[in-house]
Swiss-Prot record:
It is found in: Host nucleus; Host cytoplasm. GO terms for biological process: DNA-templated transcription; symbiont-mediated suppression of host gene expression; symbiont-mediated suppression of host mRNA transcription via inhibition of RNA polymerase II activity; viral RNA genome replication; viral transcription. Influenza RNA polymerase is composed of three subunits: PB1, PB2 and PA. Interacts (via N-terminus) with PA (via C-terminus). Interacts (via C-terminus) with PB2 (via N-terminus); this interaction is essential for transcription initiation. Interacts (via C-terminus) with human PKP2 (via N-terminus); the interaction competitively inhibits the interaction between the RNA polymerase subunits PB1 and PB2. Belongs to the influenza viruses polymerase PB1 family. The gene is PB1. GO terms for molecular function: nucleotide binding; RNA binding; RNA-directed RNA polymerase activity. This is RNA-directed RNA polymerase catalytic subunit. It comes from Influenza A virus (strain A/Russia:St.Petersburg/8/2006 H1N1).
């Protein structure tokens, strides 16, 4: 029977059907090839928005820089980045007046964080620009490389393990006349194989020392590497995102800590909370505006969109904000916080891989690296690319483009939210001094504005005033893309509000299904997703039950583990049938071993092993969960694991799921092909790093949930811990005198070796 899809909506209120229009089913679009073009677009656009600013030259790097601050006031609706310092400072002052002590208290909280944060905070995060190798690396490796280079150049404050001390080294490094670095490289040689007599390519790994002069080092320290943002739905064009290096990251982290602390105290801020907490916060603001607009007042809401938020923001403005917020604080604290915006005012954007050329005869392909764009003949390029390159050329230095104005995506989300909220704060009647007033919500570049006034003219006047105030702070509300509605219907950060928030279920669609981690994790994540959607997203019992059945079906097809009594033939069915036949209690078999599904919507919170434990045959229990079974992966048995879920918008979020270690929780091995590439040295470093950390955690079993705070090195800490434990074990009779002496001797030897080093 054919179903007419419109029939599905007969009983559904229109606002609940909104989610069906979202582009969230199927695979998201990924970018291929180089991001060089997108990055040049960003750089050129940013300069265009600030073109009436003042040009200066950076004395250290020689980079040309454009400063639009306090530039001409806009005369049209075109986006522009001419923020006015005095207006920003005034907005900050009013924000403080409405929230007495907010900056003071947040500074005190941040100061505590600054003094306690360990360097390993910087190992969080994914790809990071590694300035020593001039390309992206996992954060932990990039940090390890940076510290290694610092130490070989005599910068050792970082050895205390505190982030603030690492940052002292960063500051120190910028004053050095030169920095020595070690780079990995590979040589390729064609040689004849003795056995097969064929020619083969032999690769040898090498490390070479290189010296960077002050200028080259500064350029690298100020570089943001760029990539194309992947998996963006609902857009035809891709765009570039930036990943900063380790020199910038620590400073940004402290600024964002302060800004986060402020955002937590602002009722209009959609950050840093998320999910239901965010919805509750938003609903409060709406309720306030609705109850205060009595019968005499009209209330309208703008679903707002800003034009190129990041490209019109300016680090110099952020510096002014920070200077104001920290004005009564100790000098060292103000200095630490002001470095991030100063570095961003002098930032360089790396243009990525460059362009790939193919000859017409298709026999030749060649890569033009970004470094060559400054000098190459432009006749090889098409018109649009030629225009881009011509425009960007004056800004190029060593393959990077000088980009003083603008912020890159996602760098100062919290701080830019504070800026946005400061405008919303100005909507109170005591500031507008007229009959209209406004309030709203801000979350990074997304906003919703609620305007109340006695009549339509008042509403219009309020919106105009808001629009102009934004312009003064370098924020450009898009008149084309924002729309206004009677209060009660609007959208904010993909939450749809219609007298309460409507579940936008389509956004969760990508996280349904089998994740592909391993049989154990996938089962757990699958049922957790369904459970979470019943709690948060109006997933009803009938639909949840159906989702569960579809998930189990999907799971069985993915892992070829159909029930033992099924007729379906797969590669595993022979083994599974054998197990099925010799099992007394068939209900106890896990789904991944061909067992039946015992999940229903009431028991989704119980891990499958626990759900079936009482039903299992004893020998099956013994095989499944025996720590001595070499196939049971016991890293650390933590009761909770984290899966990275990709929601339809916003950053990947961590989702917790119950983890029970069994023979099914295997970890796939690293692909071997990496071992032949120049990444190999990096990989060895990473394994070394891993081994040290594992060893450390053996000495301090609690370190997996609490970082040691102190200034001794890892080795010293382990030696002293070993001494204490040995003495306790000896005194309680757990070890013999000989063992005690031997361990103490080893400890002394280690200390002696450290001293000699």
């Amino acid at each position: 029977m054919d179903v007419n899809p419109t029939l599905l909506f007969l009983k559904v209120p229109a606002q609940n059907a909104i989610s069906t229009t979202f582009p969230y089913t199927g695979d998201p679009p990924y970018s291929h090839g180089t991001g060089t073009g997108y990055t040049m677009d960003t750089v050129n656009r940013t300069h265009q928005y600030s073109e009436k600013g003042r040009w200066t030259t950076n004395t250290e790097t020689g980079a040309p820089q454009l400063n639009p601050i306090d530039g001409p006031l806009p005369e049209d609706n075109e986006p522009s980045g001419y923020a006015q310092t005095d207006c920003v400072l005034e907005a900050m002052a009013f924000l403080e007046e409405s929230h007495p002590g907010i900056f003071e208290n947040s500074c005190i909280e941040t100061m505590e964080v600054v003094q306690q944060t360990r360097v390993d905070k910087l190992t969080q995060g994914r790809q990071t620009y590694d300035w020593t190798l001039n390309r992206n690396q996992p954060a932990a490796t990039a940090l390890a490389n940076t510290i290694e280079v610092f130490r070989s150049n005599g910068l050792t404050a970082n050895e205390s393990g505190r982030l603030i001390d690492f940052l002292k080294d960063v500051m120190e490094s910028m004053n050095k006349e030169e920095m020595g670095i070690t780079t990995h490289f590979q040589r390729k040689r064609r040689v004849r194989d003795n056995m097969t007599k064929k020619m083969i390519t032999q690769r040898t790994m090498g490390k070479k020392k290189q010296r960077l002069n002050k200028r080259s080092y500064l350029i690298r320290a100020l570089t943001l590497n760029t990539m194309t943002k992947d998996a963006e739905r609902g857009k035809l064009k891709r765009r570039a995102i930036a990943t900063p290096g380790m020199q910038i990251r620590g400073f940004v982290y402290f600024v964002e800590t302060l800004a986060r602390s402020i955002c937590e105290k602002l009722e209009q801020s959609g950050l840093p909370v998320g999910g239901n907490e965010k919805k509750a916060k938003l609903a409060n603001v709406v309720r306030k505006m609705m109850t205060n607009s009595q019968d005499t007042e009209l209330s309208f809401t703008i679903t707002g969109d800003n034009t190129k938020w990041n490209e019109n923001q300016n680090p110099r403005m952020f510096l002014a904000m920070i200077t104001y917020m920290t004005r009564n604080q100790p000098e060292w604290f103000r200095n630490v916080l002001s470095i991030a915006p100063i570095m961003f005012s002098n930032k360089m954007a790396r243009l990525g891989k460059g362009y790939m050329f193919e000859s017409k005869s298709m026999k030749l392909r060649t890569q033009i690296p970004a470094e060559m764009l400054a000098s190459i003949d432009l006749k090889y390029f098409n018109d649009s690319t030629r225009k881009k390159i011509e425009k960007i050329r004056p800004l190029l230095i060593e393959g990077t483009a000088s980009l003083s104005p603008g912020m890159m995506m996602g760098m100062f989300n919290m701080l830019s939210t504070v800026l946005g909220v400061s405008i919303l704060n100005l909507g109170q009647k005591r500031y507008t001094k007229t009959t209209y007033w406004w309030d709203g919500l801000q979350s990074s570049d997304d906003f919703a504005l609620i305007v109340n006034a006695p009549n339509h003219e008042g509403i219009q006047a309020g919106v105009d005033r808001f629009y102009r105030t934004c312009k003064l702070l370098g924020i450009n509300m898009s008149k084309k893309k924002s729309y206004i509605n009677r209060t009660g219907t609007f959208e904010f950060t993909s939450f749809f509000y219609r007298y309460g928030f409507v579940a936008n279920f389509s956004m969760e669609l990508p996280s349904f299904g089998v994740s592909g981690i391993n049989e154990s994790a996938d089962m757990s994540i699958g049922v957790t997703v369904i459970k979470n959607n019943m709690i948060n997203n109006d997933l009803g019992p009938a639909t949840a039950q159906m989702a569960l059945q579809l998930f189990i079906k999907d799971y069985r097809y993915t892992y070829r583990c159909h029930r033992g009594d099924t007729q379906i033939q797969t590669r595993r069915s022979f083994e599974i049938k054998k197990l099925w036949e010799q099992t007394r209690s068939k209900a106890g078999l896990l789904v991944s071993d061909g067992g039946p599904n015992l999940y229903n919507i009431r028991n989704l919170h119980i891990p499958e092993v626990c759900l079936k434990w009482e039903l299992m045959d004893e020998d099956y229990q013994g095989r499944l969960c025996n720590p001595l079974n070499p196939f049971v992966s016991h890293k650390e048995i933590e009761s909770m694991n984290n899966a990275v879920m990709m929601p339809a918008h916003g950053p990947a979020k961590n989702m917790e799921y119950d983890a029970v270690a069994t023979t099914h929780s295997w970890i796939p091995k690293r692909n071997r092909s990496i071992l032949n590439t120049s990444q190999r040295g990096v990989l060895e470093d990473e394994q070394m790093y891993q081994r040290c950390c594992n060893l450390f955690e053996k000495f301090f079993p609690s370190s997996s949930y609490r970082r040691p705070v102190g200034i001794s090195s890892m080795v010293e800490a382990m030696v002293s811990r070993a001494r204490i434990d040995t003495r306790i074990d000896f005194e309680s009779g757990r070890i013999k005198k000989e063992e005690f002496t031997e361990i103490m001797k080893i400890c002394s030897t280690i200390e002696e070796l450290r001293r000699q080093k």
